[in-house]
């Protein structure tokens, strides 16, 4: 039982300190695009860069999706900034 409670606590701590979402351009407010064939490598590099500090990234629905970013990371949609408007 103690092992279960400890595992549950570790999972909850991981959920609190990790953020998932689409990378966003601060200039346009749009998602950072990618292509399905080569996008996974590109997105992984972008997501794990020093700018975003994510754990992993991949191309999903023609946009870069990141997992494990810090809570203060900006992801799509940005407040007060709509894409293309």
From Swiss-Prot:
SMART domains: Knot1. It comes from the Eukaryota. It is found in: Secreted. SUPFAM superfamilies: Scorpion toxin-like (SSF57095). The keyword Cell membrane does not apply. Keywords: Amidation, Disulfide bond, Ion channel impairing toxin, Neurotoxin, Secreted, Signal, Toxin, Voltage-gated sodium channel impairing toxin. Disulfide bonds join 30-83, 34-59, 43-64, 47-66. GO terms for molecular function: sodium channel inhibitor activity; toxin activity. Pfam families: Toxin_3 (PF00537). The modification Cysteine amide is found at residue 83. GO terms for biological process: defense response. Expressed by the venom gland. GO terms for cellular component: extracellular region. Gene3D superfamilies: Knottin, scorpion toxin-like. Its main location: secreted. Residues 19-84 form the LCN-type CS-alpha/beta domain. Residues 1-18 form the signal peptide. The keyword Phosphoprotein does not apply. InterPro entries: LCN-type_CS_alpha_beta_dom (IPR044062), Scorpion_toxin-like (IPR003614), Scorpion_toxin-like_sf (IPR036574), Scorpion_toxinL (IPR018218), Scorpion_toxinL/defensin (IPR002061). Beta toxins bind voltage-independently at site-4 of sodium channels (Nav) and shift the voltage of activation toward more negative potentials thereby affecting sodium channel activation and promoting spontaneous and repetitive firing. Belongs to the long (4 C-C) scorpion toxin superfamily. Sodium channel inhibitor family. Beta subfamily. Has the structural arrangement of an alpha-helix connected to antiparallel beta-sheets by disulfide bonds (CS-alpha/beta). This is Beta-toxin Ct6. It comes from Centruroides tecomanus (Scorpion). The lineage of its organism: Eukaryota, Metazoa, Ecdysozoa, Arthropoda, Chelicerata.
């Amino acid at each position: 039982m103690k092992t279960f409670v400890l595992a549950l606590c570790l999972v909850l701590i991981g959920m609190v300190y990790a953020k998932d979402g689409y990378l966003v351009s601060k200039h346009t407010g749009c998602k950072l695009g990618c292509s399905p064939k080569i996008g996974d490598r590109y997105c992984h590099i972008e997501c794990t860069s020093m700018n975003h500090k994510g754990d992993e990234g991949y191309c999903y629905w023609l946009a870069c999706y990141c997992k494990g970013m810090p809570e203060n990371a900006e992801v799509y949609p940005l407040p007060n900034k709509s894409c293309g408007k």
